[in-house]
UniProtKB/Swiss-Prot annotation:
This is Probable transcriptional regulatory protein Xfasm12_1059. One of its GO terms (molecular function) is DNA binding. GO terms for cellular component: cytosol. The keyword Chloroplast does not apply.
Length: 244
């Protein structure tokens, strides 16, 4: 009978995954700080990324060093934002957001991933029209009743409130511009989201199965594992990929 991975092997895998997450967040901090300054109180984009870093258990020292490097107080690599679009097998639309210090390397890695899995890269705007950019705040029913969260969200300027009874979850939808304000106003009422992000949501999902689902899942996994890739969005139905 075969033996499973050792405790040390599992720990190493966990540390490696954590390291990749930290690397990506540090790049995001740098870009946000360079674009809007190193003061999170006057830079909503930086504030969002810092919240994400703290939620991932990144230390304040690491966050502060990343900000200082970005604004020139410490030496560091400069990254730029790049977005690629394309199609996975089955006509699944994919958006890939990257932070890179070498565009040629990044586009080569992303193109190789698409080709390897039977997809293809497209021109700018080829799939983005199928998505909307939204702020999403996720709350558990346990922290407050549906009516209270809904009323607070509307008063704070949210666009919509979605209730998922089966998942015991309430989603508050905002515009990207109103995201930080809505989050902070609801937090002032004691309503803290367990997850908050600005993301792309597809207008409609595509269902895939069989070998197509396997290839789509493989492509998304490869893209997400690339060091330069920050976020991957698609319009594939996640249930068909076994990701819900």
């Amino acid at each position: 009978m075969g033996r499973g991975p050792s405790i040390e092997a599992r720990k190493n895998a966990s540390d490696s995954k954590r390291g990749k997450i930290f690397t990506k967040i540090i790049r995001q901090i740098g870009v946000a700080a360079r674009a809007g300054g190193g003061d999170p109180y006057n830079n909503p984009s930086l504030r969002v990324v810092i919240d994400k870093a703290l939620a991932s258990n990144m230390s304040k020292d690491v966050i502060e060093r990343a900000i200082k490097k970005a604004i020139g107080e410490m030496e560091g690599v400069q990254y730029e934002e790049v977005r690629y679009e394309g199609y996975a097998p089955g006509g699944v639309a994919v958006i890939v957001d990257c932070l890179t210090d070498n565009r040629l390397r990044t586009v080569s890695d992303v193109r190789h991933a698409f080709s390897k899995c039977g997809g293809n890269m497209g021109a700018e705007g080829s799939v983005a029209f199928m998505f909307k950019r939204l702020g999403v705040l996720s709350y558990a029913h346990a922290i407050a009743d549906e009516e209270l969260i809904t009323e607070a969200a509307i008063d704070a300027g949210a666009e919509d409130v979605m209730v998922y009874t089966q998942d015991d979850e309430i989603e508050v939808i905002t515009t990207p511009e109103a995201f930080s304000r809505v989050k902070e106003e609801m937090a002032a009422l004691g309503l803290m989201p367990y997850h908050a992000e600005i993301t792309f949501r597809a207008d409609s999902d595509i269902v895939v199965d069989g070998d197509t689902a396997i290839q789509v899942r493989k492509l998304l996994d490869i893209l997400e594992d690339l060091d330069d890739v920050q976020d991957v969005y698609s319009n594939v139905d996640q249930v068909t990929l076994g990701k819900r």
